From Swiss-Prot:
GO terms for biological process: glutamyl-tRNA aminoacylation. It comes from Mesoplasma florum (strain ATCC 33453 / NBRC 100688 / NCTC 11704 / L1) (Acholeplasma florum). Monomer. InterPro entries: aa-tRNA-synth_I_cd-bd (IPR045462), aa-tRNA-synth_I_codon-bd_sub2 (IPR020751), aa-tRNA-synth_I_CS (IPR001412), aa_tRNA-synth_I_cd-bd_sf (IPR008925), Glu-tRNA-ligase_bac/mito (IPR004527), Glu/Gln-tRNA-synth (IPR000924), Glu/Gln-tRNA-synth_Ib_cat-dom (IPR020058), GluQ/Sye (IPR049940). It is found in: Cytoplasm. It catalyses: tRNA(Glu) + L-glutamate + ATP = L-glutamyl-tRNA(Glu) + AMP + diphosphate. The gene is gltX. This is Glutamate--tRNA ligase.
């Protein structure tokens, strides 16, 4: 059987985001499931739009996610596969475009930009919606072509589209039919001698012996042009599969303008998401394994991958689900792993950790291990431990709704003031004693104590919070609500 070789081919015109991560990840799973090769190729022919640092960012974030390339320009494969950056293959594209001219599958187009615009405007005026090239230069005589060349007239190279019906067997969408009459003769080499996307991608996929092309459905319209190029050269066509769109909560295509969803992988990295959780969630966008299990390791996903289980319907990016999956991975970390990871995200300008002991800081951080959705959220919980916090008017109003809260706070203050051995078990016993002495329990007991001791109505284990705040800070906080 032919070896499975799949590729992810980003353009360095932007940074790694959810959409192209899904493409890379699915190609990776597909290749690894069949013990094949996963290739990362750079499509950098759009020189004016290339963004500095984008290539480095792509590789850095792919590696962070665990989507590791078997081949790339950093790790080339066999010499026969050619270069892994399109900007290093201009000669190859030009040579093959000229070959198509020699076998009458392409021709030089000498039309100027102004002539083309006029032609398209005339078509629109006639009510033609899907405008296309008229084919004017395909009818030039040899002498006319020679004359234009001698005059050094600029030309592009256009593919001569044959009249045919293409039946494409898409392994996700099923059979798709195209009438080539709708395409028009398209440019494969621009006047600046740079190959267009549809031509370069076919040459690259052929050179690299790509067996399957798995990509987003926005590329479906490119597929007939690419297949025609394969056929013109007499090359074997890879299998094509087009994944459904990823949409946001409003049903629009996910983009950097989508409301509550982060778009770029770097944003998730900076907020303290775990790469394993990101890998897990993104793998479930438009694809599903057999069974109900949602938390899956990379190795499990490789083993379970099935190219017949892609969805034909759009997949909604659910930020709540993303956070939930990450929280499960956070909970699964060992205490040592959790502490090492979370400390990287503490805002040290807001919270002076150097003034505190390592043991105390560890205990504070561990209070929130089961509560964090992502590591940066730790900063939402540290204020009461590091800084002076005023009790909000909203919190005071909550306190007022609890009958006889004053007596609970007074008794709590009395017991705290006389507590000599500051230990968690002693604090638990103290709270129990306050309950016995006031006859209060449940919310009527714990809410006044929590607000009085921590200036907040929310938090983890009450005794742990009181212990870590320390006696002096607790007494100072009580004074704020008396």
């Amino acid at each position: 059987m032919t070896k499975f070789r799949l590729r992810y081919a980003p353009s360095p015109t932007g940074f790694l985001h959810i959409g192209n991560t899904r493409t890379a990840l699915m190609n990776y799973l597909f290749a690894k499931h069949y013990n094949g090769d996963f290739i990362v190729r750079i499509e950098d022919t759009d020189l004016e739009r290339n963004v500095e640092g984008a290539i480095e960012s792509q590789f850095e974030n792919l590696n962070w996610l665990g989507i590791n390339a078997d081949e790339s320009f950093l790790k080339p494969g066999e010499e026969k596969y050619g270069k892994y950056m399109q900007s290093q293959k201009f000669g190859r594209y030009q040579e093959l475009a000229e070959k198509l001219i020699s076998i009458k599958k392409a021709y030089r187009c000498f039309c100027t930009t102004e002539e083309l615009e006029k032609d398209y405007e005339d078509q629109v005026a006639k009510g033609i919606v899907a405008t296309k090239y008229s084919g004017k230069c395909s009818r030039l005589s040899e002498s006319e072509i020679e004359s234009n060349l001698k005059s050094n007239k600029d030309f592009s190279i256009r593919f001569l589209v044959p009249e045919t019906t293409l039946n494409i067997k898409d392994f996700i969408k099923g059979e798709i039919t195209f009438d080539s009459k709708e395409l028009g003769d398209f440019v494969i080499l621009k006047t600046n001698k740079i190959a267009t996307y549809n031509f370069a991608v076919v040459v690259d996929d052929f050179d690299m012996e790509i067996s399957h092309v798995l990509r987003g459905e926005e590329h479906i319209s490119n597929t007939p042009r690419q297949i025609l190029i394969y056929q013109a050269f007499g090359w074997e066509t890879p299998q094509f599969g087009h994944m459904s769109l990823i949409v946001d909560s409003t049903g629009k295509k996910l983009s950097k303008r989508s409301g509550n969803a982060l778009f770029f992988i770097e944003q998730y990295k900076n907020q303290g998401y775990l790469p394993e959780a990101m890998f897990n969630y993104i793998s479930l966008l438009g694809w599903s394994p057999i069974g109900e299990k949602e938390l899956l390791t990379k190795q499990e996903l490789i083993s379970m991958f099935d190219d017949k289980r892609f969805s034909k319907s759009p997949s909604t990016f659910d930020m709540t689900k993303m956070k939930w999956i990450n929280s499960q991975y956070m909970k699964a970390l060992s205490e040592e792993e959790y502490l090492e990871f979370t400390k990287k995200y503490i805002n040290t300008e807001m919270f002076n950790t150097k003034e505190k002991s390592e043991d105390w800081l560890n205990q504070v951080l561990l209070l929130f291990k089961k509560e964090l959705e992502f590591a940066d959220q730790i900063n939402n919980h540290l204020n009461i431990f590091f800084n002076e916090v005023d009790v909000t008017s909203e919190t005071i109003e909550i306190l007022k709704t609890i009958e006889e809260h004053e007596s609970v706070i007074k008794e709590f203050e009395t017991q705290i003031s006389t507590l000599n051995e500051w230990e968690i078990e002693n604090i638990k016993s103290l709270i129990k004693l306050v309950s016995e002495n006031t006859g209060k329990k449940g919310k009527d007991l714990f809410m006044p104590i929590r607000i009085a001791s921590s200036s907040s109505e929310h938090g983890p284990s009450l005794a742990d919070v009181i212990y870590l705040l320390g006696k002096d800070k607790v007494l100072a906080n009580i004074a704020k609500v008396k």
